[in-house]
Each structure stands twice: as structure tokens, then as C-alpha cells.
């Protein structure tokens, strides 16, 4: 018997909804490892929901799956955008839906994996992204301000103008902060108020991996050290030598920004490492505004449970039912 016996889209109204598994949680919590382990047992494909893993040539600090893992199991939306290529949330949403539907036609379970809350919400809640044309002059002024005074300055401005939007946007993602302020500037309304929701026709089961904060801090600190051992400095040098400027949105990611500063001579390597750890801790706290243990729509598991056979049975039970609420 196939794992997917239903249709999607307009024809789904009289049919069971096609399944979509979501694996979410903090950075460094083991989401990709769980997805890959599941896909080795259940016919599945993995779809990226991490805003940093979309870029090519940027592999180490983004902690992408390895090449061998991506060759063994179908992976979508990884390493397909050049570091200097603009890419919008609306484009991601469209491509994610295409990947989900493609996997359904292949009789594979789509597994959406990531920690970028905005990417996940755009797909799962069916956001209608505001059709506001870019204002290059306004954007340039904000980018210049962020470069001179720091990204925190314009993020604080967003917090004042639209507190709800500020809770949904990574403060380190300057491009998305600028976009939100741009929409507010051009429409006179709140960015958060313009996001109309139209959930897609999928039967969704969300699994979240929870690791106590202090334990997770220790894990990501060790991962920072490992990234340096894996050649992060050489990766950043290669990007800069190829002409990718440190001011690019893609280069604002944790690891790339700090190592670029070290290479430019503005900070020491020790300072770069400490900043990477500090920023990763801050990202974890930011992600916790998206992924709450009190969210009853998420089935929370421990790291140990994510490595057990029980999680495979849990997903099989989900596939065998027509109502995710029957899964406990």
C-alpha cells in the first residue's frame, strides 16, 4: 500500500488531504538528522525551511546536510541561490509548495525541515505576501543606516512601528527587516496586518525537538568550534575573493559576518568566535518566540526520543490516520 493515497490542490475537496510532516526546533537541535533517519525508512523527500541554507557556496556555517546525504535522499531548496542573488519570501513559498506537490506525485512524504519561523509560517499558514513594489531609494537609506549604526537600530525602529512583525522576523536578517519597514512606509499600515492567511490543503503533523536551553547552548558552542576546524575561515575567504561583499544579506548569517570582520582585521579570531556563540544564543531565544512548548499543535520530543524507533512508529501512525489529532 502506498504511503500517500490522496490528492492536493483544487481536486482535494472530496479526498483525504495529502500528508505533510514538519520537523522544527532551535538551531543545533538535530532536525536534519531526524529527517534523514526517517527518510531512510519511510519513502520521503526533505524540503529546506532554513533561510540560510538556500545559498550555494555557503555550507559550513549554515550546517547543511552533507553531499552524500543529499545524494542518498531527495533534498529540495538547498544551495540553489547565489550569495548575491535577491530572493523573496513569496518566491520561497511558491517553490516550497511546488516541492511538496512534486513529492506527493512521487508517492513520497514531504518533510519540511527548518528553524526559520517566517518560512514555516508562510507555507503552513498560506500567507498572501503583500504585493508592494520595492522602493530602492528607501531601501538604500535603511541599508546604509544599518551598515553605519548597526542592524539593531533599524530593528528597534520596526519594534516601535509593528511589534507583532518584529516577533516574527529574525533581527539579524537585515533584508527582511528593511522589507517590513518598506511595506509599512508605502502602505501606511502594519506589515503584520497585511499578511492574509489561506492555509494550503495539506494534513500537517508537526514534530518539534526540544533541548533544554543551557544544554543547547553548550551544543552550539561546540558546533562553532567544529565549524572552524572544518574550514569556515577558508570558506569565507573564498566568498570574499569571488567578489561577494561582506555587506550582502547572505553574508549577514552567523559565522560569515564575524569571520569576514576577522579577515578584514577589525576583530580578532577570538572575538569572532565569541560573537558567533553570542549571536547563536540570541538566535535560539528568538526562535523560541516561534516554537513554544505550550503550542499544542506541535508534538514535542526530546533529543533522545528523536533518535529512537518510537519516532518512526509515530510518523507511521500519522500516515495511517486521516486526522493528525489522533496522534499523541
From Swiss-Prot:
Binding site for ATP: 25-32
Region spans: Interaction with substrate tRNA: 50-53
Any one GO molecular function term: tRNA dimethylallyltransferase activity
Cofactor needs: Mg(2+)
EC number: 2.5.1.75
GO biological process: tRNA modification
Matches recorded under InterPro entries: Dimethylallyltransferase, IPT, P-loop_NTPase
Lipoprotein among keywords: no
Catalytic activity: adenosine(37) in tRNA + dimethylallyl diphosphate = N(6)-dimethylallyladenosine(37) in tRNA + diphosphate
Site residues by UniProt (Interaction with substrate tRNA): 116, 139
Top-rank taxon, per record: Bacteria
Secretion signal, residue range per the UniProt entry: none
Alphabetically ordered keywords of this record: ATP-binding, Magnesium, Nucleotide-binding, Transferase, tRNA processing
Family: Belongs to the IPP transferase family.
Functional note: Catalyzes the transfer of a dimethylallyl group onto the adenine at position 37 in tRNAs that read codons beginning with uridine, leading to the formation of N6-(dimethylallyl)adenosine (i(6)A).
Alphabetical list of NCBIfam families matching this protein: miaA
Quaternary structure, from the entry: Monomer.
Descriptive protein name: tRNA dimethylallyltransferase
Organism expressing this protein natively: Dehalococcoides mccartyi (strain CBDB1)
Gene that specifies this protein: miaA
Amino acid at each position: 500500500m502506498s504511503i500517500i493515497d490522496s490528492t492536493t490542490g483544487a481536486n482535494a475537496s472530496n479526498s483525504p488531504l495529502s500528508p505533510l510532516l514538519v520537523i522544527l526546533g532551535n538551531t543545533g537541535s538535530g532536525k536534519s538528522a531526524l529527517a534523514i533517519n526517517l527518510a531512510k525508512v519511510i519513502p520521503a523527500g526533505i524540503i529546506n525551511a532554513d533561510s540560510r541554507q538556500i545559498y550555494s557556496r555557503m555550507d559550513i556555517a549554515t550546517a547543511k546536510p552533507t553531499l552524500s546525504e543529499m545524494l542518498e535522499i531527495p533534498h529540495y531548496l538547498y544551495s540553489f541561490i547565489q550569495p548575491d542573488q535577491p530572493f523573496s519570501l513569496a518566491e520561497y513559498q511558491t517553490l516550497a509548495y511546488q516541492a511538496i506537490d512534486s513529492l506527493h506525485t512521487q508517492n513520497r512524504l514531504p518533510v519540511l525541515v527548518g528553524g526559520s519561523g517566517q518560512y514555516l509560517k508562510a507555507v503552513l499558514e498560506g500567507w498572501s505576501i503583500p504585493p508592494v513594489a520595492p522602493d530602492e531609494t528607501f531601501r538604500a537609506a535603511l541599508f546604509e543606516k544599518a551598515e553605519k549604526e548597526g542592524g539593531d537600530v533599524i530593528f528597534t525602529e520596526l519594534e516601535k512601528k509593528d511589534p507583532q512583525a518584529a516577533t516574527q522576523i529574525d533581527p539579524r536578517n537585515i533584508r527582511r527587516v528593511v522589507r517590513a519597514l518598506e511595506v509599512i512606509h508605502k502602505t501606511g499600515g502594519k506589515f503584520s496586518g497585511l499578511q492574509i492567511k489561506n492555509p494550503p490543503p495539506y494534513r500537517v503533523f508537526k514534530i518539534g525537538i526540544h533541548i533544554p536551553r543551557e544544554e543547547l547552548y553548550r551544543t552550539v558552542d561546540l558546533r562553532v568550534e567544529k565549524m572552524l576546524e572544518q574550514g569556515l575561515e577558508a570558506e569565507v575567504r573564498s566568498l570574499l575573493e569571488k567578489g561577494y561583499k561582506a555587506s550582502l544579506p547572505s553574508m549577514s548569517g552567523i559565522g560569515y559576518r564575524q569571520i569576514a570582520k576577522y579577515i578584514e582585521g577589525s576583530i580578532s579570531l577570538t572575538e569572532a568566535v565569541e560573537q558567533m556563540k553570542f549571536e547563536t544564543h540570541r538566535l535560539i531565544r528568538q526562535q523560541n518566540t516561534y516554537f513554544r512548548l505550550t503550542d499544542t499543535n506541535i508534538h514535542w520530543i526530546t533529543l533522545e526520543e528523536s533518535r529512537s524507533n518510537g519516532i518512526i512508529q509515530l510518523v507511521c501512525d500519522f500516515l495511517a490516520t486521516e486526522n493528525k489529532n489522533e496522534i499523541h
